[in-house]
Amino acid sequence: RGLGDVYKRQTKTIFLDHLSILISGLDGDERKMIDTTMTKLRSLVERTGIKLFLVSHLRRTQTDKNHEEGARVTLGQLRGSAAISQLADEVWGLERNQQTEAVDQTILRVLKNRYSGEVGVACQLKYNKDTCKYDETTEPIFNPSTDF
């Protein structure tokens, strides 16, 4: 669908899952294609005022601990291009250790916040199999005065 549909339908929010699929099948350098796509998406957000949530996969870690084992997510691990983090207003990382009994728990980490600059662990989420939703856990896992 084109930009006209965004205006016609008065779209307020778009979820794009995921960036790699958007550019797959195109010929050329992946990094340059991501740069171009991110610039166009940023322009779309500026022109229309929509909220755009974009999913980006991660590069493998350079440490002994990988993401499947709960490794901390960083901006530099976004796969493809630095334009992903440079053009975003906010970047969030989801961290989950699949090798533990608490496999249903996920940490939401703010990696970039253009407006306030506050980054760090935002909350811990727990997957509810009955509702198929994530709920924020009631037990705090961070100290707001030191983790932001």
State the predicted function of each range:
Residues 21, 58:
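Short glycine-rich anion-binding loops that position phosphate/pyrophosphate groups of nucleotides
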Residues 23-30:
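Conserved ATPase-coupling elements of RecA-like P-loop NTPase cores
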Residues 51-57:
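Structural recognition of the conserved hydrophobic beta-strand(s) that form the central parallel beta-sheet
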